[in-house]
């Protein structure tokens, strides 16, 4: 193992090129080797300063620097004392900052030559150099996305962006949202100083800047420096600062997300003191977050679980990588049109079929409108847009499916209709073509009975709007082959979506679980709980949309239809149909003609533009809203527990078998609160562990019904002290 991952090369002009290249992994991260290497390199720079004219910092990896080592932040804690862990992280963080500060003040100019992605800790390293040049190459991405993991930039990112950009600019454009920017956008924001077109141009540009700026210092190390836009005590900044906590609260809707508030505090407090004191303030807030449960949850979900899935964690072994050449989409409505678009965007030829050619053309028009917007925003070029649209072929002729190797049906939700459309094309497509259905409710095994090759039939459930929603739920039927599952996972990754795999069951995983959240909220309405109280509980739990609002958007009539179909299927199988307090409320609203948002009336009233104007007073009158008072946390946890307990049942029944798939599917597919790390992580991290969760479930069951009784499998796992 090399003792130093930062190679040193000095040219005849005295310019030292430092190249970061961790020999033990594919990306550079802030692991122990980097920490030792940085310290040794800074010591050498200081010792040889008189023979150095300047320094270029670059990377041998395609990614400039991948940031902090999240494994170090989450692993190896076990039952260690919290104070011990916090002290260790504090010491490590301060050591990093000390060496970065030495780098930027050792007396010679340093320029970063950013040859790829510089996110999080990677960007923080460059902020400790006097100049930043980025290559505008594929994969180049610049930013401080720590807030999306429940963290703040702990390597000086808060302190230096505030001093570089000003408090308001740093907070609003970099820190609080954590955007990942292309190099030109990063330059516009002020995070980088120059952009070159290729990696080959980086070193010459860096050396040119060094020759022209031999005495360069950081702005904050220069005499007379003031924070751009003013310090917290200046009138212009003092005007907007008091509103920031309220703005954050409105954005978070009361959800337990501590990172944005910690970022705001670190930025403002740090701007009132010298840079060295500011970095200590930043460290304290960083450590409070990284040792907290929310960050641990979010790191697990958005880094480890997501990485597992996108690396093909649920993909069967032993099958070559598959690339779809020609995709046949049946049904050119909203879903079919959008599936055609994302497939064509990934470079695939698409046949878009409907029963009417005008309908098929309207389906293609969906892509044309999206491309018009992309052109106006500078997200694509005319040439690329024309090529994409040329790949979509609207048709009514089943014979145009000749050569299709992947079919995705998005027709009306009827077994008979779906059987019919597959019969039209089954003998036309390639003999081993994937036969996929975008159904969200119908059993895949039943649909597969309508084709000759049931082993090639599979569910490919997209979420609306397809071009924005990142998840695809892949459903295995009873006869679906591993080979077809592998193909569909490859297709999903190719269109830049995240695949989760579930087994066939009515409602699959996502639709089945989200229904319990909605039902629990609606049942509370029927109990006489104030609807606004219920909506507030949903928001403060961290759901993206409040439950009654979401019900209106999904349509109450559709909810009733799915419930009735499910009940009929359960009866046909000899099962017991269980009543729920939500059913009578939905039925009564539909009797009043209140189907939801599209009808202009549901739980809410709507104006002529479809905007909510308030909860319907008739609802309060009917159910004597406010007559029943329950603890706020009970309402929050009724919704969270309903989904979590249903997920346990899905594991028991084999509907879902992967914890990462369940966590990511719940967050990306049905809006389970991100701070929890997903529906399974919510159970694992509950206070008192699984036993604490089981005890609370019993408590909720005693108050609100037996459907909160924990499944026996969960009780047994808790008794053994295990986790999922």
Would you name each region that the model predicts?
Residues 1-58, 101:
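Conserved CoA-thioester-binding segment of acyl-CoA-metabolizing enzymes
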Residues 9-11, 21, 73-80, 84-85, ...:
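N-terminal glycine-rich phosphate-binding loop for ADP-containing cofactors
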